[in-house]
């Protein structure tokens, strides 16, 4: 195509679309259409992805005789949140999950509680009287579960090279827990079901609930009252995730330590503690408001969650006291 033909081609474009076509208007409409499609992509994507999975009747995958039900629950929770529901806390900007905040905080709360349990398994329950060698699978899982939940396959703040994502680390931790539980069923791993081990585990959980309660109280004191609070939902769902995971782990821990629970006549106290955690897990307001704790018009959902949290912690302390006797 020579120069004259090329010029003629471009001069005929307006005639093709009709006389009086405004090229600027076409560009503007195209840009607006693109913006609309991008917004639709994010909004629909967020609606599809978003899920606060707080099923209090959730059951672990079937464990074999001799295996730990609590470990099986930890495995099932990791698998559900990472593989089935999809981990969203580290979604990059071009994915709809990037704009979510409730689900990421909730998922990270769950993983945090599991990591606390894994630490106790490594330090106490997975060893004979705390003096034997640390179990390699438990040690590996405990370390991997501490990995930040917001790391994608690239972390430009540290390096331009690819790195291990949060999902990859948590799946690796899950495989280590599966390996440990399998060896436990085969009789080649330790699960020391002594009362003092249970006591130490409950004490660690209670301490974590205490720090969580302090964070809620501090936030209520500094920003509560008006109901509009952009940080309240982050704190709420992070705490809810922890409490939900603790509820499920403690429910199964009672089965693993059934002889201690029955021998110390803890069943009634244990069930009351579980009920407090269950009530906290079921809190599901459409919008998180942070009004006054005694507000008649604008409630404080953080205060409501904090109430159940403190009650569960108090009941845990009572169980710990009974175990000391």
Pin down the residues of each PLM region:
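N-terminal Lys/Arg-rich, disordered targeting/topogenic segments
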Residues: 1-22
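Hydrophobic membrane-insertion alpha-helices, especially the h-region
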Residues: 28-43
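Hydrophobic single-pass membrane-insertion segments
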Residues: 40-55
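N-terminal Sec/ER secretory leader and immediately downstream segment
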Residues: 54-159
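A cross-kingdom marker for long, charged
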Residues: 58-61, 244-325
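A cross-kingdom feature marking solvent-exposed beta-strand/loop segments within repeated
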Residues: 93-102, 155-158, 224-233, 286-304
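Long, amphipathic, charge-rich alpha-helical segments that form helical bundles/coiled-coils
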Residues: 137-158, 166-178, 269-294
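Extended amphipathic alpha-helical interaction segments
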Residues: 163-275, 279-282
């Amino acid at each position: 195509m020579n120069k004259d033909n090329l010029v003629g081609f471009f001069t005929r474009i307006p005639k093709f679309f009709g006389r009086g076509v405004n090229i600027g208007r076409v560009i503007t409409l195209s840009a607006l259409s693109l913006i609309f499609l991008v917004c639709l992509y994010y909004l629909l994507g967020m609606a599809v992805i978003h899920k606060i999975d707080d099923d209090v009747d959730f059951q672990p995958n079937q464990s074999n005789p001799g295996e730990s039900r609590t470990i099986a629950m930890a495995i099932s929770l990791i698998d559900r949140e990472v593989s089935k529901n999809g981990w969203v806390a580290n979604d990059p900007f071009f994915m709809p999950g990037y704009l979510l905040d409730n689900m990421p905080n909730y998922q990270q709360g769950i993983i945090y509680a599991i990591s606390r349990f894994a630490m106790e398994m490594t330090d106490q329950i997975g060893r004979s009287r705390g003096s034997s060698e640390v179990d390699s699978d438990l040690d590996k899982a405990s370390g991997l579960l501490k990995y930040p939940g917001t790391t994608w396959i690239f972390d430009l703040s540290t390096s331009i090279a690819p790195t291990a994502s949060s999902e990859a680390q948590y799946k690796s931790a899950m495989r280590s827990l599966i390996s440990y539980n399998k060896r436990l069923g085969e009789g080649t791993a330790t699960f020391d079901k002594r009362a003092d081990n249970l006591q130490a585990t409950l004490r660690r959980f209670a301490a974590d609930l205490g720090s969580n309660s302090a964070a809620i109280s501090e936030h209520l004191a500094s920003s509560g009252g008006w109901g509009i609070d952009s940080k309240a939902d982050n704190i709420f769902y992070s705490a809810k995730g922890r409490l939900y995971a603790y509820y499920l782990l403690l429910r199964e821990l009672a089965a693993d330590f059934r002889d201690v629970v029955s021998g110390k006549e803890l069943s009634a106290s244990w069930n009351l503690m579980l009920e407090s955690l269950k009530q906290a897990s079921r809190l599901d307001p459409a919008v998180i408001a942070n009004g006054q704790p005694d507000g008649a018009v604008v409630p404080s959902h953080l205060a409501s969650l904090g109430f159940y949290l403190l009650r569960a912690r108090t009941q845990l302390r009572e169980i710990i006291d009974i175990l000391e006797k």
